[in-house]
Structures are given as structure tokens and as C-alpha cells.
């Protein structure tokens, strides 16, 4: 009998369970097996738990945010080798289809492309994970970067970095970011690299507002109730030049376009539990450009370089650490936003 391991598994709607499964094996020449050293819980995992991700397959190991050590590689893998410390990209991508060649890797057309890990195939809240297309999905961690510093490179930081990149931010802009959760903060860190004139962070949770003020004092903060008037008072052209919606609520979706100036860019980063309405009659004349900022993992090597250079630091987001054996406690803490939690690291 092959080696078995502990995994956190999607059993059915509303139910995850810690259980034993066989250790994964190579299934394709482009696969790698990674010993997971550190994983994290993402809000997308909660969406799976609550049945909001129809493509999620019951029985799979959840988790798509992790780092680890390469244990074994397929014969076609060239960029990583056993012993390498690596980040794991949430998106699997072949590197060869139309969308991959354009750099839109989250739209990879391969059957294992897109968000597969922890959704359609076994993910990384486990001791080991099989990573398809390892040359594309794994990035070597620089020696000077710790696992904790690199933990978010393949998911929430990739999301924030991609969203900032497609938002066409200039140094003259007022940028509004709605939502100061983990992805919102990673979006903030990525926007700060663009050096806009001012950044406004909108958040309803006072503890998260305190976190922003403590760590990023140059950023203006405001509650949702006061956001519209505050943005009007702190922008030159009747609203924000760029709005990034990272909160994922019906009210924040509306707030995003309301706070945008005419001809602004509104980038929707959030994942919603239900359909949203775009009230075109109310918006008529604003001539807004909407973009969607789903995670795209083509910049992970660049973000690792920026971390190594000290230009991005996501480690303060890790407020709690649990062993895999206590992952149910970690989920309860994260889902209920207790004790000032922002992100939880899970030692596997």
C-alpha cells in the first residue's frame, strides 16, 4: 500500500473534513509532486464550502495557496528539480494555447487549465500536492525570501498585482480600493508600486481599518457610509480616477461605480456569491470602463523579485498560524473574522 497523508477535503455543501488519502503520484510527464510546507485559507475556499463554486468537485482536497519543496518531477519538467523551494500558482496553465500565449493564463483552455487546484483536482491543504504543468505553475523562491514571505505569491498577491496592472494607474490618479481584506491589502500593495497621487481605502471593519492605518499611514481610510462624500472631497474631477472593488458585496459593487468619476476605470476584483445588477440607466453618461481582475499568475516571478528587493511585504498579513491537524479551528477563526484575523498560515 502506498503512503497516506492528511488532507482537508470538500465532502459536500457546507462540509469540509480532515481525512487520510493516498499520497499523490505523477500522472503526466509535466507534473511535479510538492511537499507542502505552508498553506493558507482563502475566501474562495469558503465559497466552495458554501456551494458558490459550481465547478468545485466534492471529494477533492481543498486549498490553492501554498509553498513547498519539490519532491519529484515528470520527465518533461525542466525549470524545477527535487529540493527546490517553490510557490504554487493557483492557476494551472499549459503555456501553449491561444490564451496562454497572450498572457491570459487564467483562461487556459486545457482540461486542467485555470483554477483546478483545490477546486477540480486535489489542492494543497495537505502534506503533498500534485501540480500539473509544473514548469508554468511553480516558481523557485529566492534564497533570501522565507516561506512566509512567499506564501501569497500564487494567489491573493497574484490577484492584486494583476488587478493593479490592468487598471492603467498613473501618478496623477486618485485610486479607491473597496475592501481591506487579504486580497484588498495585496491589491493595495500592488497599487502603491504605481505611485498614484493618493490612495483611499474603504472598509467597514474597524480592526482592518486600524491595520491599514498602522502599516500604511500614507493611505487615506474611510467607512462605506462616508465613502462617496469623502472621495468627492479628495478628488479633483468628481470622483476617483480608478476604483478597484475587492469586497464582493452588492452594496460595494454599487459603491464602486458611484464613486468613480466620468470616464474612470472600475476594476472588479471580488468574487460574488450571487449575480450583480448593472443599473445602466443610473450610470448613463458616466462612460465607465469596467474590467474584471480575476487572478492571473503570469507575474509570479516578478513579484518574488519584488519581495526579495523589499518592495512588497505581505508577511504582516499572517496574523495566526495553525498546524494542519487543527485546520478546522483555523477555518472557524478565518470565516468568522475573530481575533483580528487577516490570513491564517497552516503548517503542513
Regions found by a protein language model. Give the residues of each.
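Conserved acidic E/D residue at the C-terminus of a beta-strand in Rossmann-like folds
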Residues: 203, 270, 294
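NAD(P)H dinucleotide-binding glycine-rich loop of Rossmann-like/cofactor-binding domains
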Residues: 96-178
Amino acid at each position: 500500500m502506498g503512503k497516506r497523508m492528511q488532507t482537508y477535503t470538500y465532502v459536500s455543501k457546507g462540509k469540509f473534513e480532515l481525512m487520510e488519502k493516498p499520497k499523490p503520484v505523477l500522472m503526466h510527464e509535466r507534473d511535479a509532486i510538492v511537499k507542502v510546507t505552508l498553506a493558507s485559507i482563502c475566501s474562495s475556499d469558503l465559497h466552495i464550502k458554501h456551494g458558490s463554486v459550481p465547478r468545485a468537485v466534492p471529494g477533492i482536497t481543498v486549498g490553492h495557496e501554498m509553498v513547498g519543496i519539490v519532491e519529484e518531477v515528470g520527465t518533461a519538467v525542466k525549470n524545477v528539480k527535487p529540493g527546490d523551494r517553490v510557490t504554487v500558482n493557483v492557476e494551472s496553465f499549459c503555456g501553449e494555447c491561444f490564451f496562454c500565449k497572450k498572457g491570459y493564463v487564467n483562461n487556459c483552455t486545457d482540461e486542467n487549465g485555470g483554477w483546478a487546484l483545490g477546486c477540480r483536482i486535489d489542492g494543497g491543504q495537505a502534506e503533498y500536492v500534485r501540480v500539473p504543468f509544473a514548469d508554468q505553475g511553480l516558481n523557485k523562491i529566492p534564497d533570501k525570501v522565507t516561506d512566509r514571505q512567499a506564501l501569497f505569491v500564487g494567489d491573493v498577491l497574484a490577484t492584486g498585482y494583476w488587478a493593479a496592472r490592468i487598471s492603467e494607474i498613473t501618478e496623477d490618479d486618485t485610486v479607491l480600493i473597496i475592501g481591506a481584506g487579504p486580497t484588498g491589502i495585496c491589491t493595495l500593495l500592488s497599487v502603491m508600486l504605481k505611485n498614484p497621487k493618493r490612495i483611499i481605502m474603504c472598509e467597514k471593519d474597524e480592526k482592518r481599518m486600524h491595520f491599514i492605518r498602522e502599516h500604511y499611514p500614507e493611505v487615506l481610510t474611510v467607512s462605506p457610509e462616508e465613502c462617496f462624500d469623502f472621495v468627492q472631497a479628495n478628488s479633483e474631477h468628481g470622483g476617483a480616477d480608478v476604483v478597484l472593488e475587492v469586497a464582493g458585496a452588492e452594496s460595494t459593487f454599487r459603491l464602486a461605480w458611484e464613486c468613480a468619476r466620468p470616464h474612470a476605470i472600475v476594476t472588479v476584483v471580488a468574487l460574488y456569491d450571487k449575480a450583480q445588477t448593472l443599473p445602466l440607466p443610473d450610470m448613463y453618461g458616466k462612460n465607465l470602463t469596467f474590467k474584471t481582475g480575476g487572478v492571473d499568475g503570469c507575474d509570479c516571478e516578478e513579484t518574488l523579485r519584488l519581495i526579495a528587493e523589499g518592495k512588497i511585504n505581505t508577511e504582516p498579513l499572517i496574523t495566526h498560524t495553525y498546524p494542519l491537524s487543527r485546520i478546522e479551528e483555523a477555518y472557524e477563526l478565518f470565516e468568522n473574522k475573530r481575533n483580528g484575523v487577516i490570513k491564517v498560515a497552516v503548517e503542513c
